[in-house]
Amino acid sequence: TDRQVRGLLLDVLRDGDGTATAARLDAVWPDALQRGRALASLVDDGLMVRVGDRYSLPG
């Protein structure tokens, strides 16, 4: 589900230094469309920030 993918993507940021490249997040889930929806919704919801090819936790 999209919710599952959102959780996996956030886990990558939480388990690291709070930032990850788009390529690193691409490795989390094989379905590019579903992963893209999840990333977009996380950014729209303010739970993730995108700067260039990197994503990070807000703040």
Where are these regions (language model features)?
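HhH-family (HhH-GPD) DNA N-glycosylase catalytic core used in base-excision repair
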Residues: 1-59
